[in-house]
Amino acid sequence: MKIKLLSAILLLAFVAITSSCRRDTVVADNLSYMPFESQCLGTSLDGNVRIKAWGSGATRGDAIENAKRNALRDVIFNGVKLGNPACQRPLTYEVNAHERHEMYFNRFFADGGEYTQYATLEDETLTSRTKAKGDVQQNYGVVVTVKRANLQQKLINDGIINPYNY
C-alpha cells in the first residue's frame, strides 16, 4: 500500500513538473524572413501598453531585444495599428522625426541603451512566444510591456516631442 501511494505521489509530481515546462510555438521556416506587424493587446490605467511584437536576429536573445526595440518604435513613430484601438495614436506626429533626431534615437536604441527602461518582457511562463527559425535568422514574437506614459514624459523633457500636441 505504501509503495502504491509513494508511486502515485511521484507520478503526480512528475506530471506537474513536466506540464509546467513551456515550449515555443514554432511556425514554418520560410516565415523567419517575413516581416510581422506588432499587435496591441491592451492598455492599463497606469499608462502601460501590452504589445505582441516581433524581432529577428541571429540568436534568440538578439531577436527578443529587437522585438522590444520594434515595439518602442511602433509606439513612438507609427502607433500600433493591429489589435486594440487604444494604441493606434503614436507619441509623435512629426514627419521624419526619427531622421531629424537620429543621433538621439541611435543612442536611445543602442545595445544596453535607455530603451531597456521603457520596454520589458512579460513573465514568459504566462505569455505565448512564437518562433520562426530559418537557416540564418530567427524571428520571435513576444509580449512586451511598454511604459508609454513614462516614455512620453521623457521625450517631452528631452525636447523630442511637443507637449502641446496632447
Language model features: what each stretch is:
Residues 1-8:
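Bacterial N-terminal signal peptides that target proteins for export
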Residues 2, 20-21:
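Generic N-terminal leader/processing signal
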Residues 8-16:
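Bacterial N-terminal signal peptides
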